Regions:
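Short, hydrophobic alpha-helical segments
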Residues: 261-262, 284-286
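Conserved donor-nucleotide binding/catalytic region of nucleotide-linked donor-dependent transferases
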Residues: 252-274
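Nucleotide-sugar donor-binding catalytic core of glycosyltransferases
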Residues: 4-214, 221, 225, 229-239, ...
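Conserved acidic donor-binding segment of nucleotide-sugar-dependent glycosyltransferases
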Residues: 244-250
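Residues at or immediately preceding the N-termini of alpha-helices
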Residues: 190, 250-253
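Solvent-exposed, flexible loop/coil residues
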Residues: 215, 243-244
Length: 286
C-alpha cells in the first residue's frame, strides 16, 4: 500500500516515522537497508558508482542498487580483490547472466534473481520494507500473535495495488473460489494489516514490479506460509529452507494447501535461520 492511500493524519504519522527512522534499520529482520549495512561499501546512486570506479580497490563485499548493477560491467577491475556483490533495494529483475559484472566479482547475491545457480550466484531475500519508509517495515507489527491451529485455512488475498497482471489474475480466481480464498479490501493501517495477516495460515504473494515481494517475507515473519506462482526465482529459494507453496496457477491453491496441511506445521519464524540478519553476516563473512 502506498502512502497516498492513507488519511491525512495517517500520512502525518508516516512522515514523523520517516524522520525518526531516517538512516535506521530493522535488525535483526531482513531488509534492503539492513543487508547494505553489513557490506564494506554501498552504491546507492550514480555518484557512488563513479566514486567506486575511480577510487575503490579494497572493498570485499559491495552492495549495489540492483538497477545500477549492469553499469558495473563498464569498470576496469584490474588487480581488484576477490569481491562479493550484494544487489538489492530495487524492483529490478535479474533475468540474464549478462546483467552482472563477472570480471569484477567472484560471487553474487541478487534480489529478484532468475539466474541463480547455487554455485556463485544466489538469490537474496528482499525482506521487509525499509524502516525509513515508515509504513510496513515496523518490527512491532511483525510479531506472531496467533498460533498455527487457530488460524483460518483460507488464503488471504490483498489488499495490494495493481502493479502486475498476476495480481489481477489472482483476484479473478479468488472472486470465483470463495471457499479457498478470502479477499481483504483496503486501505488498512499497518497495525490492522498485521493483525489481519496473523489470522491466516496462507498468504497469496503475487509478484508486483519485481518478482519478490515484501509480503512474502512479512508472511514468514508472522508465522504464515506464502503462496507464489512457481518460477526460477521461487525454486532458487530452496537453499534457504523456508516454508512456502509454489503453484502453477492460482486455481491450484486449494489442492496445494491440502497437500501442505497433511505435513507437520511449519517451523516458527524464530527457527528459520535465513530470516535473520546474523545468518547473512555469517554466510557472507562480514
Amino acid at each position: 500500500m502506498s502512502k497516498g492511500t492513507f488519511s491525512i493524519p495517517a500520512r502525518l504519522l508516516i512522515r514523523l516515522r520517516q524522520l525518526r527512522y531516517h538512516n535506521s534499520i530493522s535488525s535483526p529482520f531482513l531488509s534492503g537497508d539492513g543487508l547494505a549495512s553489513i557490506c564494506d561499501l554501498v552504491i546507492n546512486n550514480q555518484s557512488d558508482l563513479e566514486a567506486f570506479a575511480r577510487h575503490d580497490r579494497n572493498s570485499r563485499i559491495v552492495f549495489c542498487r540492483s538497477d545500477l548493477v549492469p553499469e558495473l560491467s563498464r569498470i576496469d577491475f584490474v588487480s581488484s580483490p576477490r569481491r562479493t556483490l550484494i544487489a538489492g533495494n530495487s524492483d529490478y529483475d535479474f533475468t540474464a547472466s549478462s546483467q552482472i559484472p563477472h570480471d569484477g566479482f567472484e560471487s553474487f547475491h541478487l534480489q529478484n534473481s532468475f539466474i541463480s545457480n547455487d554455485e556463485n550466484i544466489f538469490t537474496l531475500p528482499i525482506g521487509i520494507e525499509n524502516l525509513s519508509i515508515g509504513i510496513n517495515g515496523l518490527p512491532n507489527n511483525l510479531k506472531v500473535t496467533k498460533d498455527w491451529n487457530s488460524r483460518s485455512t483460507k488464503v488471504m488475498v490483498g489488499p495490494f495495488s495493481p502493479t502486475h497482471t498476476e495480481r489481477k489474475e489472482l483476484l479473478e480466481v479468488a472472486e470465483q473460489e470463495t471457499k479457498v480464498f478470502k479477499i481483504i479490501k483496503g486501505p488498512l493501517s499497518p497495525k490492522r494489516f498485521a493483525q489481519e495477516m496473523n489470522g491466516y495460515k496462507f498468504i497469496a504473494c503475487p509478484r508486483g514490479n519485481g518478482i519478490d515481494t515484501h509480503r512474502f517475507w512479512e508472511a514468514l515473519y508472522r508465522g504464515s506460509v506464502p503462496i507464489v506462482i512457481a518460477s526460477k526465482w521461487s525454486n532458487s529459494l530452496k537453499y534457504l529452507d523456508l516454508p512456502l507453496i509454489e503453484v502453477s496457477n492460482w486455481a491450484e491453491a486449494g489442492n496445494a494447501i491440502k497437500e501442505f496441511t497433511d505435513q507437520s506445521p511449519p517451523k516458527p519464524p524464530s527457527e528459520l535461520k535465513s530470516l535473520w540478519l546474523p545468518f547473512w553476516k555469517e554466510l557472507l563473512g562480514c
